[in-house]
Amino acid sequence: MNINVADLLNGNYILLLFVVLALGLCLGKLRLGSVQLGNSIGVLVVSLLLGQQHFSINTDALNLGFMLFIFCVGVEAGPNFFSIFFRDGKNYLMLALVMVGSALLIALGLGKLFGWDIGLTAGMLAGSMTSTPVLVGAGDTLRHSGIASTQLSSALDNLSLGYALTYLIGLVSLIVGARYLPKLQHQDLQTSAQQIARERGLDTDANRKVYLPVIRAYRVGPELVAWTDGKNLRELGIYRQTGCYIERIRRNGILANPDGDAVLQMGDEIALVGYPDAHARLDPSFRNGKEVFDRDLLDMRIVTEEIVVKNHNAVGRRLAQLKLTDHGCFLNRVIRSQIEMPIDDNVVLNKGDVLQVSGDARRVKTIADRIGFISIHSQVTDLLAFCAFFIIGLMIGMITFQFRNFSFGIGNAAGLLFAGIMLGFLRANHPTFGYIPQGALNMVKEFGLMVFMAGVGLSAGSGISNGLGAVGGQMLIAGLVVSLIPVVICFLFGAYVLRMNRALLFGAMMGARTCAPAMEIISDTARSNIPALGYAGTYAIANVLLTLAGTLIVIIWPGLG
């Protein structure tokens, strides 16, 4: 039995799609030195190669892929988008505007200089910025621009071609820039990180090990009674002195949860909760030969929960003002926009921040009710909310505007992005609404992106050989310029106009480029996760601005003559 693989793939779009995805994901695991190719590049390369052999895919699959991707980007950005935009993000907003705006203007200038069409120019901008949202926004606006079908087909092919030719250039150049640009300026990144840490009281030990609190029980002897000197628990401030707090007391066989007015007496049995190192540092009067093992006394359910900041009495307050330890709770992590932040008493809490807190289940529940809610650990996605907001996004995208003889629509990309932001924002404020497990969100986002990249490559593959010969050298130059010059402009603006701390500035620059690999290099250079504060500040805004840049470049292009 003979099987013609080419005919088999051409006759089955679904089979072709998953063959491209599987081969591309395998290729993406390869490394060039310390740089991994990545899934996007792997799928793009494989799809380009198969596209050269005249394999093609249904455009509906491509459209669905980018719709899912851009919607999920909005859902991720939603919890912090409005707080950054309206309150704390003036510097971060300005940095993102400078980065995206300068890249847009440079791309427009180079496109006119080299005589390219809008497809090549927008594709070059998207690839150089390693930004799929630019590609998505430009492609969607082109489809709704009302230009002739033959011109539209050529522009969309060139859009994919420009992106394919410059993506790797943009990625590698930014990674190299992230490694060497900090060394070209006069301030050491590690020193800058330490400086901001001292100013804000940050915990600079980013690699500290996080332990869960444990419970141990001790019998009160004469030494401990003498140590307390008749003071009640509130006056003693045991947590401040030992790092542990008294959760339970057994007195005369009666088990009770003490309040601040309780005074320790001879023969009491007390249950102390604290980190292992805090137990090890206890004064000998607590533990020398007096530890007890009592099932009832030690029967406590220590839990670790992720608490989402929501309530108005917590939003805008500093972490220290929550006084978690006074309520018998221990803070393990602070997460903002999927980025782990330094545990900093002076960090101002934003709506949607996630605090990982450990302690007795009842105490954790109490503190969660006070500052927000416990993140739902269900693995069930609220598909109704997902579908409803997806529909809303598509309806927003149908809105069109007419200017003289030129019409353009908001487009599916911008509409879905806005709808996703609203879903993410509402989810951060309403615990029972719109829940999407992070794993499910990542899977849908990644799958949508990979489907889109496969469609882009198969569409552009047939013309890539001619494109390389005609504009390959120009694309190389333009890709480097658009990738690096906006970074330099952004650095100069942040350093000398905004006068930002360099560790925060470099983190914010990488956030404005939405490039996680480059962010890791900056953190390694600073030997701190302080730059993550800046990265989180610009990342959500930049995702939105980059999508709008893809739309704007198509709208502006006809007016340049």
Swiss-Prot record:
Listed transmembrane segments: 8-28, 32-52, 66-86, 94-114, 158-178, 383-403, 406-426, 447-467, 475-495, 540-560
One GO CC term, this protein: plasma membrane
A Pfam family annotated for this UniProt entry: TrkA_C
Keyword Ribonucleoprotein annotated: no
UniProt topology in membrane: Multi-pass membrane protein
Any one GO molecular-function label of the UniProt entry: monoatomic cation transmembrane transporter activity
Keyword Zinc (UniProt): no
RCK C-terminal domain segment(s): 200-288, 292-373
Gene3D superfamilies in the record: Regulator of K+ conductance, C-terminal domain
NCBIfam families per record: PRK04972.1 (NF003440), YidE_YbjL_dupl (TIGR01625)
Protein name in UniProt: Putative transport protein YbjL
Protein's organism: Salmonella typhi
Gene name, Swiss-Prot/TrEMBL: ybjL
